[in-house]
Amino acid sequence: MASLNLEIITPERVVLQAEAASVIAPGIQGYLGVLPEHAPLITPLQAGVVTCRRRERAEERVAVSGGFLEAGPDQVIILADTAERSEEIDVEWARQARERAERRLRERPPGLDVARAEAALRRAVARLKAAGAI
């Protein structure tokens, strides 16, 4: 049965190298799925959860903060700004980050960079989802 070679890479390290049956990633227009024999594709990613479905294990989740996905017939390469495997995520820290971002967006202090606060909220939510905390 066909499979995909998945690599998730940040500027600092290779976060995940795995053989996958399928990959689901957070495209800018919604989540997209990649199966073996996929047509060539390059697309930007937003903050969210990349799900690697494996044959020998159910799945592995990685929180990404954005980047690009390149897919081909037998491989998927994700170049992410940042990425954390589910087991690396500090859930309490991510909850606090989400609460801080929500509070800033709710209170709207003078000089608030709304886009930056919204991006922080999306990153925190992605971490919590990848860790299975929400």
UniProtKB/Swiss-Prot annotation:
Chief location: membrane
Name the source's superkingdom. Bacteria
Q: A cellular component term (GO) from this record?
A: plasma membrane
User: Where does this polypeptide localize?
Assistant: Cell membrane
Record's subunit section: F-type ATPases have 2 components, CF(1) - the catalytic core - and CF(0) - the membrane proton channel. CF(1) has five subunits: alpha(3), beta(3), gamma(1), delta(1), epsilon(1). CF(0) has three main subunits: a, b and c. In this bacterium the a and b subunits are transcribed but do not seem to be translated, thus the ATP synthase consists of the alpha, beta, gamma, delta, epsilon and c subunits.
Tell me the function of this protein: Produces ATP from ADP in the presence of a proton gradient across the membrane.
What protein am I looking at? ATP synthase epsilon chain
Species the sequence originates in: Moorella thermoacetica (strain ATCC 39073 / JCM 9320)
